[in-house]
């Protein structure tokens, strides 16, 4: 027969186990969500997140200037390898950086099919 103290200890242990399991699941899903923040179209993103953020800044600025719904996503399409991205570079008056930005886009899109 189980005493009241043993029963309470067993219940506490069960709750502790449940909390640990839920924390592990939450942590895992949070990590996956953070990884999805970055563009899935860019195959060479790992190790080049600093380049990605610099190139993405152009799209964010463009979206802020024109306030067109989905403009930032259109600019990021195909890992920035599109005419809309080039248009945004011109619209944000960063044409002097065009060659550098194109090089970064090629690095990010290396291996893209």
Curated annotation (Swiss-Prot):
What are the recorded Gene Ontology BP terms?
Answer: circadian rhythm; neuropeptide signaling pathway
Q: Which Gene3D superfamilies match?
A: Crustacean CHH/MIH/GIH neurohormone
Record flagged with keyword Cell membrane: no
Q: Which InterPro entries match?
A: Crust_neurhormone_CS, Crust_neurohorm, Crust_neurohorm_sf, Hyperglycemic, Hyperglycemic2
Which range is the signal sequence, renumbered to this chain?
A: 1-35
Subcellular localization, per the record? Answer: Secreted
User: Got any disulfides in this one, which pairs?
Assistant: 42-79, 59-75, 62-88
Recorded GO cellular component terms are:
extracellular region
User: What is the protein's name according to its record?
Assistant: Molt-inhibiting hormone
């Amino acid at each position: 027969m189980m005493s009241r103290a043993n029963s309470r200890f067993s219940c506490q242990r069960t709750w502790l186990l449940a909390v640990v399991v839920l924390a592990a699941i939450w942590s895992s899903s949070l990590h996956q969500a953070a990884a999805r923040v970055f563009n899935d179209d860019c195959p060479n993103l790992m190790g080049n997140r600093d380049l990605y953020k610099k190139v993405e800044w152009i799209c964010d600025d463009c979206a802020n200037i024109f306030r067109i719904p989905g403009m930032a996503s259109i600019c990021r399409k195909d890992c920035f390898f599109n005419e809309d991205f080039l248009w945004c570079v011109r619209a944000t008056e960063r044409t002097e950086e065009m060659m550098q930005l194109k090089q970064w886009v090629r690095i990010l899109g290396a291996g893209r099919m």
